[in-house]
Amino acid sequence: MNLVTAHDYAWIRTSPLFRHAMESGYTLTLIRARTPREVLRVMGAEPRGTGEGTAVLIEADDAHRAEVDYDYWDESYVAGAFSTPGENGAWTLVLGFDGGLGIAGACVETLSKGGRVVAHSTNGGKPIHLFHWFEDGELRTTFEGPSSRDGNTPDELVPLLREVGLPLTPEGEHDESAPDVDVKAAVLALAERLTGIRVTESLLQDATYELGLVPEQPAEEWTGVVIDITDAQGERLHRGWAYEEIATASDRARAEANAPVVITFNEPSAMDRSEYETGD
């Protein structure tokens, strides 16, 4: 029985590699019953050979960033994948210093069919820490904060979340009385509980990676925007706009901005002109 907890991942806070991952943004994905080449193919990655250790992966990604002139908006990146044993057979571990973008949702659904995918990420800078668990093509549980879960079975992992040290009540609510815990370390422990893979610095540094250049993903179509804000006094603002409303307003604003400026001048009356000319 796997009893790993957040304590077993305390090493991440003294690891130069993990510090780099947190600062640059990363995604670590574990995929059951898929080979590294198969995973990179589904991701649409262009093969970039193999490399020993994370240093080669970082160098390859840095070289790609230079190729695109360090374009901030370019979301392509070099990912590394290798095979490692875990629960119920071989798994593929994919690591990318991708700013926390993660593998595209459609790809993960495909990769998890007939198996399991577990992923965690950080976007660096102003950190957003995400966790995802897919099973047989279905997003079962996802969260940023463990007390605000989503997915088709958002509460299924609550017992495991509590066991690895996350501060939750048996009902899955935040437990104010629970001791402080390193949430990121707890998430890595949770991933091990679901995969049987102990991620260590040496595992990542010593692996032989299949490298692939992951292209930018096309933007998803959207149908509207919702603003849902609750202020410190508990006042809530909830309002939504359909795509058509936003498009109409945008077209109107654009037309007004491009319209010619007309300056009108009112001709003074004869009496006003007389007073102006005489100075009366």
Mark where each language-model region is:
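Hydrophobic alpha-helical segments that drive targeting, anchoring, or assembly
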Residues: T5-V164
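Long, compositionally biased intrinsically disordered terminal regions
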Residues: L3-T14, W133-D280
